[in-house]
Regions:
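HIT superfamily nucleotide-processing domains
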Residues: 1-93
C-alpha cells in the first residue's frame, strides 16, 4: 500500500504535486506548470466514482476546501478568471 492509498494509482503513489494543505479527507497540491500559474488540485484520499458518492457532510467539507483554494489563488495570483474543473474521469478519486 502506498502513502495515500492503493497501489498502481498515480494519485495514491505520489502526492501529485507540492502538498500545501492536508486533512483526513483530502489534500491540496500545487502543480508545477509554467503555463498555468496557481494550478492547484484538491485530491481525495480515498477512491470514489463521483463526488455525489460522498456523504452530504463530506461534500460540503470538500467544497469548502475548493472555495478556500479559489480565494487563496485569487489573492496570490489575481487571475482574470478562475477555472474550476472536476477531472476524475481517468482515476476514481
Amino acid at each position: 500500500m502506498s502513502e495515500y492509498g492503493f497501489e498502481d494509482c498515480e494519485l495514491c503513489d505520489s502526492p501529485g504535486g507540492e502538498v500545501v494543505w492536508e486533512s483526513a479527507l483530502c489534500r491540496v497540491v500545487m502543480v508545477a506548470d509554467a503555463d498555468y500559474p496557481g494550478f492547484c488540485r484538491v485530491i481525495m484520499h480515498r477512491h470514489l466514482g463521483e463526488m455525489t458518492d460522498l456523504p452530504q457532510r463530506e461534500r460540503m467539507q470538500v467544497m469548502n476546501v475548493v472555495f478556500a483554494v479559489e480565494s487563496a489563488v485569487r489573492s496570490l495570483y489575481r487571475p482574470d478568471k478562475i477555472n474550476l474543473a472536476s477531472l476524475g474521469n481517468m482515476t476514481p478519486h
